[in-house]
Amino acid sequence: MKKHIVISDPYPRRLFLIFSKKKLKELKSKYKLLKAPRLNKKDFYEKNIHKATFILGQPDLNKNLLSKATKLKCIINVESNFMDNIDYDYCFKKKIDVIATSPVFAKPVAEIALGMTLSILRDIHNAHFDFVKGKEKYGLESNLSSSLLT
C-alpha cells in the first residue's frame, strides 16, 4: 500500500520536541516524510505540495500555492499560533483542516508560568540582579516585598 506523504516543516520546532520516540517511529513507519529545507522553501513547496496529504508545520501557504495541493487534507500547525501566513478561508472552503499541537506544550507552558509567578511573588529576578551587583539583601529585608502564592 502506498504511504501518504507528509511534508515535515516544523521549524522552529524539531520533530523530537513534538513526538515521543515511539510516536515518531510510528509516524515514519506509516507515512512518507518529505523534509522541507530551511532555505528555498517556496521552490520546495511549488515542486512538492501537490504530493502532500498532510503538512506538519506553519509554512507560508497562499491561495495560489494551496490550489495546487489537491491531496491536502490537513495542516498541523506546530506553533499553535495561527499566524496570518496561511489562507485559512481557502482551507475552510476546500475542507482542509488546520489543527494545532497545543497539548504538546501544555506542561512546559504551565511550568514556565508557575516559575515566572513564583519569581514575581518572591522577587527572585530582582534579588538575582542585586546579587550580581554585590548588593544582595539577607534575612527579613530580602523578603519585605515578597508575597505568598497561597
Q: Which positions does each model-derived feature cover?
A:
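An N-terminal-biased, well-structured beta-alpha scaffold segment characteristic
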Residues: 1-99
